[in-house]
């Protein structure tokens, strides 16, 4: 509980601790060109969609670097964008 509160407070000041979950605006996430050039396989997307429909959660976490560039979780990003979600749970990595 103490860690979650500390992470939220740091997030208010733009300080993001790796390993803590934060909610960010979809529009603030930058997608590197490599992700845009290579679309996920259809089977992979179908699996990710099935999981999302069953649980309401992403199967893969969305990982960002400190510049808000996507590091991993592109399939979850695609689902969020398709569903017109505005805020997403993300984790920051070094």
What are these language model-derived features?
Residues 1-94:
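Short, charged/polar connector segments at secondary-structure boundaries
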